[in-house]
């Protein structure tokens, strides 16, 4: 059970920065 929680935490720690970086990149591309 602990491994499942750890896995979910890792997924969030990876997806959140990637999502923020992707959103910033899209805004920068739209700005141009």
Curated annotation (Swiss-Prot):
<keyword id="KW-0602">Photosynthesis</keyword>
<protein>
    <recommendedName>
        <fullName>Cytochrome b6-f complex subunit 7</fullName>
    </recommendedName>
</protein>
<keyword id="KW-0813">Transport</keyword>
<dbReference type="InterPro" id="IPR012595">
    <property type="entry name" value="PetM_cyt_b6/f_cplx_su7"/>
</dbReference>
<dbReference type="GO" id="GO:0009055">
    <property type="term" value="F:electron transfer activity"/>
</dbReference>
<keyword id="KW-0812">Transmembrane</keyword>
<dbReference type="Pfam" id="PF08041">
    <property type="entry name" value="PetM"/>
</dbReference>
<comment type="function">
    <text>Component of the cytochrome b6-f complex, which mediates electron transfer between photosystem II (PSII) and photosystem I (PSI), cyclic electron flow around PSI, and state transitions.</text>
</comment>
<dbReference type="GO" id="GO:0031676">
    <property type="term" value="C:plasma membrane-derived thylakoid membrane"/>
</dbReference>
<keyword id="KW-0249">Electron transport</keyword>
<dbReference type="GO" id="GO:0015979">
    <property type="term" value="P:photosynthesis"/>
</dbReference>
<keyword id="KW-0472">Membrane</keyword>
<dbReference type="GO" id="GO:0009512">
    <property type="term" value="C:cytochrome b6f complex"/>
</dbReference>
<feature type="transmembrane region" description="Helical">
    <location>
        <begin position="9"/>
        <end position="27"/>
    </location>
</feature>
<comment type="similarity">
    <text>Belongs to the PetM family.</text>
</comment>
<keyword id="KW-1133">Transmembrane helix</keyword>
<comment type="subunit">
    <text>The 4 large subunits of the cytochrome b6-f complex are cytochrome b6, subunit IV (17 kDa polypeptide, PetD), cytochrome f and the Rieske protein, while the 4 small subunits are PetG, PetL, PetM and PetN. The complex functions as a dimer.</text>
</comment>
<keyword id="KW-0793">Thylakoid</keyword>
